[in-house]
Amino acid sequence: MDLYMMNCELLATCSALGYLEGGTYHKEPDCLESVKDLIRYLRHEDETRDVRQQLGAAQILQSDLLPILTQHRQDKPLFDAVIRLMVNLTQPALLCFGSVPKDPTVRHHFLQVLTYLQAYKEAFASEKAFGVLSETLYELLQLGWEDRQEEDNLLIERILLLVRNILHVPANLEQEKRIDDDASIHDRLLWAIHLSGMDDLLLFLSSSSAEQQWSLHVLEIISLMFRDQKPEQLAGVGQGRLAQERSTDLAELEVLRQREVAEKRARALQRGNRHSRFGGSYVVQGLKSIGERDVVFHKGLHNLQNYSSDLGKQPRRVPKRRQAAQELSVHRRSVLNVRLFLRDFCSEFLENCYNPLMGAVKDHLLREKAQQHDETYYMWAMAFFMAFNRAAAFRPGFVSETLSIRTFHFVEQNLTNYYEMMLTDRKEAASWARRMHLALKAYQELLATVNEMDMCPDDAVRESSRIIKNNIFYMMEYRELFLALFRKFDERYHPRSFLCDLVETTHLFLKMLERFCRSRGNLMVQNKRKKRKKKKKAQEQGVAFSRSPEELQAMWSALAERLLQCAQEPELSVDSIIPFDAASEVPVEEQRVEAMVRIQDCLVAGQAPQALALLRSAREVWPEGNVFGSPVISPGEEMQLLKQILSATLPRQQEPVEGDAEEEDEEEEEEEEEELQVVQVSEKEFKFLDYLKRFACSTIVRAYVLLLRSYRQNSAHTNHCIAKMLHRLAHDLGMEALLFQLSLFCLFNQLLSDPAAAAYKELVTFAKYILGKFFALAAVNQKAFVELLFWKNTSVVREMTQGYGSLDSGSCSHRAPVWSSEEEAQLQELYLAHKDVEGQDVVETILAHLKAVPRTRKQVIHHLVRMGLADSVKDFQRKGTQIVLWTEDQELELQRLFEEFQDSDDVLGHIMKNITAKRSRARVVDKLLALGLVSERRQLHKKRRKKLAPSCMQNGEESQRDAWQEDPEEEEEKEGLPESEGEENEEDLLAGQVQGSSSLSAENLRQSLCQDGLSAPLLWLQSSLIRAADDREEDGCSQAIPLVPLTEENEEAMENKQFQHLLRKLGIRAPCSGQETFWRIPAKLSSTQLRRVAASLSERENKEEREEEPEPNPGVPGEQSPSEEHQVRAPRALLSARKRKAGLVFPKEEATGEEEWKSVPKKQQLLDSDEEDTDDERGGQAAVSGTLRIHKEKRFLVEDEDEDY
């Protein structure tokens, strides 16, 4: 960008700074204001960073800001402003743009800003600029805390940030073209820091306990100083060439010499370059071309060995998302004087600063005083300086701060967190992989330091090492770490250096673990097992036994006498009977159904004492709702209750079917199965070979082979680690067949034909060993050649070596039974007969007819696929398991249909008929709620006009079903409710079946709540209702009013189930699931009705206005059998007995019940104060008697103005 293309205001501001003349900078009178204007311009730049680019093109920092910094240091306001502007101008490009842009235009701006930053770094590589910064920083640090102002602290932080920004600028390798031992710009910058004394100030900040607030800034600066260095090289500077280094260099030179000699020999065997016009063509026998004929070769015979079918072909382009990760870290050897300075800095830092600085940084990290990802600098410093300490003069005391079990745990936790985030955050997977590499290096150095402590002559150091190893080998997390890292290795995100470090760290860990096991007789380690329970989702089925009323009556006759005797025995104890399963994962509150089933099973089995004891014990555990009878129940009522339980149809759950171990790898294909994992911690004796077997899998072997492909670039130690691990798997475990893979054999062929193969003696020896084992096996098993094409697991390896079918012949009782020919014929017949039946699960039908050998659903499905009757197991997935997202067009269509039919009697029914994408009613209701088109589910209920005329009374059964039962279509909506709501509905249904109409009245509920100490919440509820009635009289409009509890006592009352039951009886609406939080007073209740509800909460009002309930008439003769009539009347008899005992039934009920019902006007409907769902269920039971029963609870007459609820 040219200077003359700058913005006019920006150009005028830069011109007002001053000018440089003869090495002296003359500032203008408005210099300070101009600097502040530039800061303000930078604050309002656009996303292309135009102001930053224009200032970089004009070289403002080189021509104006640096001279002002060095020559006008006495002008403190101007100096502070220039430092602020420099910090802003030099901030990293990644920080400016957020990330490396993918758009070409924005990426161009990113690279342009990076180019200007590299120019700034070159301008700062002078002793003069860093001298001014060092002097200023020294003067500020000399001030005590009582004399240091807030501006001084800000200036210290800005100077440290400026040094950090300058060091952070990456080097331009293409422009510099520096080689090792040559001074680069970064080396010149480090030398300027050394000459200015800035390094001494950094050491002071690191060691001072009073300056710990700058610890993270200092650690970041130090990490940037050493980012291109290797700690082993720095430790050996100035000590002459070691014998190990000389031998390594000689080996490298020998490899190069051997390859050069081989190339010369190959060139000598070739003919001259002169072309022979009579060279002719050759036919290569045994090598087929595309047309199944022998290949015709048109070149000289000396080129035949270089022939390949791929010659002339365009190489296949690898997609960008599948390309291997690139190496980002670059290591180079700096000039000698810089390396000497860095070595001395490291030695002094380790001796005086490492422990206090790392302790302060760790404290900041644990207290969350640091910024995000600052722990990466902590782990880099740990890896670098611990490696330098090992290579220089090993002194464990210098690194004692990071040599503990807590440090191992900290690094392991971060390493685990990084690879989990790499799997979840795919967009930033490369960044998480780099952090993961830093954590792995830190873990590697921790293990290397502990291993070095084993060789220390000091007994105390060796004892410390033994304690640390005992802890890390005991914990399962540290042993499983490397297995997890190998399984999660992905070459798209992890570079080759990460795999190299992982292989070397695993080799070190296994060597330490093996030596530790040998030094001890037996090693006890922690073992965590995940106990997997495969449980079918709750599938309700009918009662396990189907008996006629006559059989039930005969069974009850045999039980009645025994039950009556047991009920009258006072010594019947219930202390030893527990009606719930304490070890079950289902909460105790939700086990009432199972308790009822257990009572029924005891009655069916003829165990009268156990059934009675279970009933009484269940009554004590679940007293709410009187589902198992009231606490003061009489023996006669108890007998009637047991009879109802015996004849009731109770929901049962299907027993979970255990799957076989043969198909464990295909468990994920069954979406209807849940996997519940329970971690069990125990101790066991550790066996090294058993642990080594965990590495015998194709995923880990594939990673080792991938690294072995670059054996020429690998170090000798890396190749040794690869060969050692593969030798452990092949020789120690006897799994040579695990390495019988064609790609590995091609690599062995390349290795054996390498001219420098003598330099890889260990790899060559191992390759010959594996090839010899393969050819020995191939002589016995001809299928081994085919097995070369595939990666193998341990079971395939065993079959290859011991014979195919050896696993089936073993004594494995957990394997699935073999299908006989008769069973296969029956399976085929059943599948062909039922596969085309609509609305039927063909697998469930087959399972119901297969009685000879018990089979699982998974076994049947996989055998159908093996027989060729089905293409895939996915053809048998159960319906309704996948959630299909709504598209924008579908949402608009749903909104249009709702607006079209919202005034009709059946809104949901019309929508279901006309919607294009067919979905269940529950999904449509949920979407209507999510879009805000309706506020509650009841607005979508089908509207029915209920006419309570005398003609309706003639057919009591139909009229009652119309008045109290929900529409069957609405019941379908309940299937989509959450599990908790379904359980509540199931319990309510159970209570309705057993208890009948014996629910507590509002008066009894109020009295019970008063006895429980909830009088104050009742008064609050009464006042809220009166206040709502007053508001509706004043405003003249009605809307739902939430009941917001403001006191803790009222809030606890709103969570009380009995209090919530009272609210439902009073007509107060519960909050909609996922939409509302508080209970609400419905808008349909008028002020008069609200006052009446409030008055019903007072004791005196309840006694005066107590209504009477007529005694139900017996059923019409001839319509019911005696047993059915007895089953219907039994709950009513029990209820009447309880009411007579409580004094709630009056003689005049029978006379006034029918008259009260007939006095209801035609345009009014009878609304029970109880909740609609429970009333519908209980009303359905009452309809069996053929008469319309009026509940005793308090009722309210509500005008039916527009619609029925």
UniProtKB/Swiss-Prot annotation:
Description of what induces expression: In both brain and pancreas, no circadian oscillation was detected.
Assembly, per entry: Monomer. Homodimer or homomultimer. Component of the circadian core oscillator, which includes the CRY proteins, CLOCK or NPAS2, ARTNL/BMAL1 or ARTNL2/BMAL2, CSKN1D and/or CSNK1E, TIMELESS, and the PER proteins. Interacts directly with PER2; the interaction with PER2 is via its second PAS domain. Interacts directly with PER1 and PER3. Interacts with CRY2, CHEK1, ATR and ATRIP. Interacts with CRY1. Interacts with CLSPN; the interaction is required for leading-strand replication. Interacts (via N-terminus) with TIPIN.
Its job: Plays an important role in the control of DNA replication, maintenance of replication fork stability, maintenance of genome stability throughout normal DNA replication, DNA repair and in the regulation of the circadian clock. Required to stabilize replication forks during DNA replication by forming a complex with TIPIN: this complex regulates DNA replication processes under both normal and stress conditions, stabilizes replication forks and influences both CHEK1 phosphorylation and the intra-S phase checkpoint in response to genotoxic stress.
One Gene Ontology biological process: cellular response to bleomycin
Principal localisation: nucleus
Region Required for nuclear localization: start-end pairs: 1081-1205
Compositional bias ranges of the Acidic residues kind: 657-676, 965-989
GO molecular function: DNA binding; enzyme activator activity; identical protein binding
Region entry Required for homodimerization and for interaction with CRY1 and CHEK1, spans: 1-309
Taxonomy, superkingdom: Eukaryota
Ranges of Basic and acidic residues composition bias in the record: 1147-1159
Entry protein name: Protein timeless homolog
